[in-house]
Amino acid sequence: MEKKLSKATICVQGGWEPKNGESRVLPIYQSTTFKYDNTEEMADLFDLKKEGYFYTRLQNPTNDAVAKKIAALEGGVGAMLTSSGQAANFYAIFNICEAGDHIVASNEIYGGTYNLFGVTIKKLGIDCTFVNPEASEEEISKAFRPNTKALFGETISNPGCKVLDIEKFARIAHSHGVPIIVDNTFPTPINCRPFEWGADIVTHSTTKYMDGHATQVGGCVVDSGNFDWDAHADRYPGLTTPDESYHGLTYTKAFGKMAYMTKLVAQLMRDLGSIPSPHNAFLLNLGLETLHLRMARHCENAQKIAEFLEQDERVAWVHYSGLKNDEAHTLAEKYLPNGSCGVMAFGLKGTRETAVKFMDSLKLISIVTHVADARSCVLHPASHTHRQLSDEQLREAGVAPDLIRLSVGIEDVNDLLADIKQALNNI
């Protein structure tokens, strides 16, 4: 039923379906365990023979209601909340990869994800090749190997604000028999639904726009249910061969389109944890209820500020896909017709110190490591989020030394413009 509803209605009423006499507002199930009357019923839960709850490290009714809402917003068959966006990306990859495997990823991605793929998962025996997402299909295909398991990209890159050609990435991935995983954090499903363009799996840092108020850290993995794992059974044995920890159960045979999500919860969440608290899920749900309203305001404010910066002689360049002269504008018209998000990147004429002086002069707009919530904030990635990367890696990730990431909130845009103008006057 939910898939027939508008995204606005799903934001408000999706996920939690109260029965007669139950709480109209999503309750917080602040409990580690759930009581059953007999041992057989509990045993069936452990054997995945029936649905239900027995330990919050795997599943919790509050968390599941919120995950169900996000799945409906994205148009997926199922979703799982994680304790951070980084955890979501790790789980999405590790659910189909093991030691000796390989992935391909866009080099236009968040610095933390770049480090996760380029350094951390290598310690688990999983290799990653980064590619320029703007390269030709033939060039990107050269990065694939016989042991490649996935292709990864961000709908709107952080912090470069480039727009991914999702259909192109999907064609490349599917031609090699692997799924495409898209981090859809910045546009959210309000402004883009990657599944409609061929994506197979979507991830989110729900800490950002979905929460919208910087009150909780979280993530989410959503599956479209469209990738045929059995058609590539040799490549994905974790899904298509018996799992000895569940008495020889095979996920694709037992759960069909829910195979990927079931394994994610029953195996990875069981063994690795990283589930958010029910209270954090409750806070996330409060944010989701106004997501459709806030995204419109974010985009409206950001468009006005980007247009101002584009015309100011002290600004060297601006990347915001809503600008007609932006290199990503054509892709934005296709994938983001109703707006992208409130995040933009720009550079000032001068040196790195010029950017620092501008940021230090801001009074209303805060310098924080966060991005994409109700309050406007600014960051210098080369000095902060991407400081672990070398100059060469910064260039590969599309992060110029002068790049300033501005996250436009939902305040009065005239107040924000006034703050930006006075800061520019101080450089």
Identify the residue ranges that each predicted region occupies.
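Conserved PLP-enzyme active-site core in the AAT-like
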Residues: 2, 8-17, 79-311
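N-terminal "arm"/small-domain region of PLP-dependent enzymes with the aminotransferase-like
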Residues: 2-60, 68
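Conserved N-terminal alpha-helix of the aminotransferase class I/II PLP-enzyme fold
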Residues: 38-90, 112-120
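Glycine-centered tight turns that cap/initiate beta-strands
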Residues: 75, 147, 314-317, 364, ...
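Well-ordered beta-strand positions enriched in small/hydrophobic/aromatic, beta-favoring residues
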Residues: 151, 219-221, 318, 344, ...
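Short hydrophobic/aromatic beta-strand micro-patches
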Residues: 222, 345-347, 407-409
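Conserved small-domain helix->loop->beta segment predominantly found in fold-type I
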Residues: 272-275, 279-281, 286, 290, ...
